[in-house]
Design a protein with these regions (language model features):
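ATP/Mg2+ or Mg2+-diphosphate-binding catalytic cores
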Residues: 2-5, 296-340
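Active-site acidic catalytic loop and adjacent metal/ATP-binding pocket
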Residues: 36-51, 55-56, 90, 195-244
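A glycine-centered beta->alpha junction motif in the catalytic cores
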Residues: 61, 96, 111-125, 171-181, ...
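Juxta-kinase regulatory segment immediately upstream of eukaryotic protein kinase catalytic domains
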Residues: 1-31
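ATP-binding pocket architecture of kinase catalytic cores
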Residues: 46-152
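An alpha-helical support segment within catalytic cores of ATP-dependent transferases
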Residues: 13-22, 148-154, 167-215, 336
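A cross-family kinase active-site recognition segment
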Residues: 94, 123-185, 209-211, 318
């Protein structure tokens, strides 16, 4: 993974795209620049003659299978066809294939293309963030209703984001115990929090009314605001998980911000304009927030070379421990009140 964030490696990927751009009708002299480096590498290609931009996503080898990528694209096509959400159109290659394969940095790498979508990510500090979350709640409800009703292709395959895949015995994003700056006391707090999360989620269950196909990464970086339109991008993490997990993903990296309760209220309000939402589901939102936060702590631990991890450092781990401690304290109070 370390090579993904070195300039020389990124340049090899870019050169690979230069040689592959013809698959989408782009000329060899198209301008190709880096947009984002995370699980994958995302680039923006612009035809200098037309000025038309295309988004190119280079997949990390060994993470998603071809079938998983095709499944993501199948859901996006269905969502667009059914008018569920504004999201960029996947662009097939000239031969009709959904996925191109390029050789770069000594490996075959899958590439998919999308239309460019205008807009800017919501600002968590702006007054507009609350109405944006109200709209996001409505979008989430539509996504969840579609996921429940959609007849998936027989070969549809996406990862399952349950407790075991997040924090349990087969973590997809690494082990939070390797977190930057984690102390013995901090580890004990998180171990205790994980036990409580596991117990609560087991009781909550994975029935079809609570668990299904979700975007799973509706954080601010994957939302684009343009006027009154709130668009959703990057379905790369979509998979099977709890529907309420989508709210937790939306407050990624700022879970401790005092505005989160107001955002939760707005999200729930927006959700209920589209579909019913039980109070028990709402009551579980703090559980999913902590689940996501510890998962992000694991991701940072396993991606310590990334710009995100380096910017957040051990302070992110410290805040995760504080959030876990506050969650445990609240859980103890709730239990005492029930027993009293």
């Amino acid at each position: 993974m370390a090579g993904l964030y070195e300039d020389a490696f990124v340049e090899q990927l870019r050169q690979g795209l230069v040689a592959t751009a013809h698959e989408w009708g782009l000329p060899p002299h198209a301008s190709i620049t880096t947009l984002n480096l995370s699980e994958n590498a995302t680039f923006k290609a612009v035809d200098p003659e037309t000025g038309h931009p295309v988004i190119l996503r280079v997949h990390r080898p060994g993470y998603h299978s071809r079938t998983e990528i095709e499944s993501e694209l199948a859901w996006i096509h269905a969502l667009r066809r059914d008018g569920i959400v504004t999201t960029p159109k996947p662009l097939p290659c000239g031969n009709g294939d959904a996925i191109a394969v390029m050789q770069a940095a000594g490996a075959a790498r899958r590439v998919v293309a999308f239309e460019f979508m205008s807009g800017a990510k919501p600002d968590a500090q702006a007054e507009s963030i609350v109405p944006a979350f109200r709209e996001l709640g409505a979008i989430s409800a539509r996504l969840h209703a579609h996921a429940r009703a959609w007849q998936r292709p027989a070969e549809f395959r996406r990862k399952v984001w349950n407790y075991e895949a997040m924090l349990g015995s087969r973590p997809l994003w690494g082990d939070w115990r390797d977190a930057l700056g984690l102390t013995a006391d901090g580890r004990a707090t998180l171990e205790r929090a994980c036990r409580v999360l596991d117990e609560k989620l087991t009781r909550y269950g994975e029935g079809p009314e609570r668990f299904g196909l979700v975007h799973a990464d509706l954080r601010l970086d994957n939302l684009l605001v343009d006027g009154d339109r709130l668009g959703v991008i990057d379905f790369d993490d979509c998979g099977f998980s709890w529907f309420m997990y989508d709210f937790a993903a939306a407050v990624s990296f700022f879970e401790e911000d005092p505005i989160v309760p107001a955002l939760q209220d707005a999200w729930v309000e927006g959700y209920r304009t589209v579909a019913p939402l039980a109070e028990e589901d709402v009551a579980f939102l703090p559980t999913f927030i902590l689940l996501r936060r510890i998962l992000l702590t694991a991701w940072i631990a396993s991606h310590a070379e990334t710009p995100t991890a380096q910017a957040l450092g051990s302070a992110f781990t410290d805040m995760t421990i504080q959030l876990a401690d506050a969650y445990l304290t609240q859980a103890e109070r709730s239990l005492a009140n029930q027993q009293g």
